[in-house]
Amino acid sequence: MSGAHGQGTVPVGEPGPADLRLVPPALAAWATAALTPDAPPARTVGIVLGCLACGVLLLAAGRSGRAPRWARGRPEWARSSIAAVLLCAAAAAASAGLHGADVRRGPVPELARRSATVTVEAELTADPRLSRPRVRGDHTAPVAVLVQARVLRVEESDGRSTRTRAPVLMIVDAGTPAPGGGRAAWLRLLPSTTLRATGRLVPALAGGERTAAVLRVRGGSGPRVVAGPSGAQRLAGRLRAGLREATDGLPGDARALLPGLVVGDTSRITPELDDAFKATDLTHLLAVSGSNLTVLLALLVGPPGLARLAERRGLAPRLGLSLRATALLAGALTLGFVIVCRPDPSVLRAAACGTVALLALATGRRRSLVPALATAVLLLVLYDPALARSYGFLLSVLATGALLVLAPGWSEALRRRGVPPRLAEALAAALAAQAVCAPVVAVLSARVSLVAVPCNLLAEAAVAPATVLGFAALATAPVGLPLAKALAWCASWPAGWIAEVARTGAALPGAGVDWPGGWPGALLLAAVTVAVVLAGRRLVRHPWWCGLLGVLLLLAVVRPAPLTRVVTGWPPPGWRFAMCDVGQGDATVLAAGAGAGVVVDAGPDPAPVDRCLRRLGITRVPLLVLTHFHADHVAGLTGVLRGREVAAIETTGFEEPGQEAEFVRKEAAARHIPVTRAVAGEERRTGPLAWRVLWPPADTAPAFDGPNDASVALLVRTGGLRLLLLGDLEPPDQQALLRSPRAAELAGVDVLKVAHHGSAYQDPELIRLAAPRLALISCGTGNPYGHPAPPTVAALRAGGALVLRTDRDGALAVGGGEGTAGPGREVEVTREEP
């Protein structure tokens, strides 16, 4: 190798086959660390002593020439490898046992079993973060602040104080965000900060993170800080805060994504954006990962494609740095990267792998990243055995291993068949990573993404510029905020592209398919993947077959509406009304012309209602009616708004619960959608639809007992059918409808959307008057409320109604009634096939 690439060039030969000698010891340590933390101490000691004795005996016997009987006849390298596996397993068992004992040691676990109220002095070990909003029944569970910490001192109610070092998860009920206090004050805390908190200890969940207990804290007044963070964490905090300030003026997606992509700050990531990244298997880009460090090191030491060589590319030779100086500078960069980005599994893996590679670079020797990766895994699981059970760590290692082992061969095969080199490398990398990671993702999500590979290909081109410009903004923010804002603005273009790829991919009707969850499902998917890879090796020799299969896959992902209707029969031609299957909640659609539909309620989760509207072909919503503000009717609002033109939102005037009402106002204001109040007597028409609002009253509202009493109720006419939609009206309000001047119009409706998910609280007189031929109930499978109530179903059937429910029958579509009037008109109902 000539010296054309700069000072310090080291002659190297052609790289040989990958060195796999460290792989078995690393896997043995990983498996042992994953299996032994919860083992009884005696069993752990037995494993350690047994493996240690066998390993030492094998090494000693090999040197003396008297090998054990089971090892005789084996070559020296095999005996050494077996000994290394045994010794690494012993070390991992010892480390896992000590860490497990550390969790169980001290008074915290016993206090947690007694649900004791204590005052602790604790040191933060990670950045505080917000829990994700969850719908529980008709309310959204309060968002809490989650804090990983290490308890240094615990004081019991009797005044007894004990020193300890127990890891805990603090769940802080800090109320709503408030400048200078409450939730905001907790979220500003930095790792290594020491604070005092009073709360109730409860046992940690089995199989969760490595914690001795959970401490539930009421922290509305803010944290009580005992000691501030370390100097390194203060510097990292200033840098991260500077990046947030530099990105404040960016568009929504780039503002949320850029801090996460650069330093792992995901505080601005919305649940909707998070779901889009999960649906497209782009979560490794949502937060900082080892790829970020790879990009930075590549700028310094050269491109990753030369990783097997002591290359002299990048900025280092142009700055006149020697080989060892380059390694030292890269090591300092790696350490700073881990501190600023926090030691997440992927970051730790990348840092350890990079450190081993840098040591090889400093000595000027040949290196291979496969042993570097194996060494990283070995060191990390010995240092922190909890990583052995981390899905993030597993995905990170699998993806890196696929890129090192599978991708080069696949790339070469693609190049031999005429694929351009750059495209072949990118395609092989995406395919290899997806092949090995998909089974693990299926364990977590019970779903397989069909758009992961193209989305990763499209996003990958933007990762490097977004990362480099983002880190430049991070470094310049403390000294020149205007320059940092300019750099962040430049970075917002590639970051916005990544977010748009995720949203577009997730919005495709066939973006993913349901798959059996758990490890049995993972094994099944792994078997299918192996079969596809083996078949693919034969298919690449037949371009026409490849093209045909590609077209079929494209059709399965895009699912054109005419083709989908022919294949699945959904939605049925001429449908008038559809009830979406959104679990324990309500979301219904009234057809209002080609691609248009009036949506009544949005369900408890954005994904199901978005999927339902997509399958129905709804792209325009002339009106979205939210009958009341319970979470099981409005929490899915962003799913209705996703990628659709929504002209207006109409709601009840009773704005409780306040949290959900504020959520609706905020989302509507962000998209400039007018919000109006529905009042009894209001009549509207759009396309083939005509409806009148029956409730709530137009005059001064009565003293409602709760949001259900203020539900918007509608009487709808479409295509000769009459539908009565009752929201969640309670019996007193149903009785008030019977006393209204136009109550006679409620008689003999074709379709009844049963109030309150078919609960037992129904007015029998209204059911008898309505006398529906079809009664539809929206409820969730196995819901804790017993919906629908057997007496309600019995009363409806006694009146001659066909009763269908989403928990058993899935999504439902109603048609018929064209050109007919009166009791003889036909009502057709279609169930969506799973």
Task: Walk through the language-model features, giving the residues of each.
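Aromatic-rich juxtamembrane segments at the membrane interface
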Residues: 2-34, 207-350, 578, 600, ...
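Membrane-interface helix/helix-cap signal primarily in integral membrane proteins
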Residues: 1-23, 66, 70-284, 515, ...
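Transmembrane helix-bundle segments that form internal channels/tunnels in multi-pass membrane proteins
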Residues: 5, 9-105, 118, 402-578, ...
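Hydrophobic alpha-helical transmembrane segments in multi-pass membrane proteins
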Residues: 270-452, 517-564, 569, 650-653, ...
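Residue-level signal for inorganic ion chemistry
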Residues: 32, 122, 392, 437, ...
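Non-globular, low-confidence helical/coil segments that flank catalytic cores
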Residues: 17, 184-187, 270, 278, ...
